[in-house]
From Swiss-Prot:
It comes from Nostoc punctiforme (strain ATCC 29133 / PCC 73102). GO terms for cellular component: cytosol. Required for maturation of 30S ribosomal subunits. Signal peptide: none annotated. This is Ribosome maturation factor RimP. InterPro entries: Ribosome_maturation_RimP, RimP_C, RimP_C_sf, RimP_N, RimP_N_sf. NCBIfam families: PRK00092.3-3. GO terms for biological process: ribosomal small subunit assembly; translation. It comes from the Bacteria. HAMAP family: RimP. Keywords: Cytoplasm, Ribosome biogenesis. It is found in: Cytoplasm. Belongs to the RimP family. The gene is rimP. SUPFAM superfamilies: YhbC-like, C-terminal domain (SSF74942), YhbC-like, N-terminal domain (SSF75420).
Length: 153
C-alpha cells in the first residue's frame, strides 16, 4: 500500500517535472529506512532520460517540497529513471509499449496461473489482452496486481 503522502507528492512533483519537460512515472516513499527515502522516477519523453534530467528535477523538486512542507521530518530525496524494467501504469504507457514483452502478475491466480508472460496487445476498461505464442489471453484487470516490461527478452 502506498504511503498516504504519495498523492500529495505526485500533485506537487508533476507540474515541477512538466516545467522541465519531464514526466513523473512513479513515486515511492520508503519509511522503513532511517532517514526515510522518497524516490521519484521520471522520464524524458523527448530522449533517453539522463543524469542531467535527474539532477535538474532533484533540485527543483527539493525546493518545492521544502516550501510546501509536505514531508514533516528529515528524508532523502532520490530522483531516478525507472529504466526498461519498469511497471506499466498509465494508459499512455500501455499504448506506447504495445507489442512489447511483459510479465503480468495476478492475485488471486487467474486460470491457475499467478504470472503471465507474453506480448502486450492492449487493455481496455475491463480486460488486458496478451499474446502468448499466437494465442490471445484475456486477463481481467481487476485481478492484475502488476504489469512490468520483460527485460529478459
Amino acid at each position: 500500500m502506498a504511503h498516504p503522502l504519495v498523492p500529495q507528492i505526485i500533485d506537487l512533483a508533476t507540474p515541477v517535472a512538466e516545467e522541465l519537460g519531464l514526466e513523473v512515472v512513479g513515486v515511492v516513499f520508503h519509511t522503513h529506512q532511517s532517514p526515510p527515502v522518497l524516490r521519484v522516477d521520471i522520464r524524458n519523453p523527448q530522449q533517453d532520460t539522463g543524469l542531467n534530467d535527474c539532477e535538474r528535477m532533484s533540485r527543483a523538486l527539493e525546493a518545492s517540497l521544502d516550501a510546501a512542507e509536505i514531508v514533516p521530518d528529515t528524508y532523502v530525496l532520490e530522483v531516478s529513471s525507472p529504466g526498461i524494467s519498469r511497471q506499466l501504469v498509465t494508459d499512455r504507457e500501455f499504448i506506447s509499449f504495445k507489442g512489447f514483452p511483459v510479465i503480468i502478475s495476478t492475485t488471486p491466480p487467474y486460470d491457475g496461473q499467478q504470472e503471465w508472460i507474453g506480448q502486450l496487445i492492449r487493455r481496455d476498461e475491463i480486460t488486458l489482452y496478451l499474446n502468448q505464442k499466437g494465442r490471445v489471453v484475456e486477463i481481467p484487470r481487476s485481478l492484475i496486481t502488476k504489469v512490468q516490461l520483460d527485460e529478459r527478452r
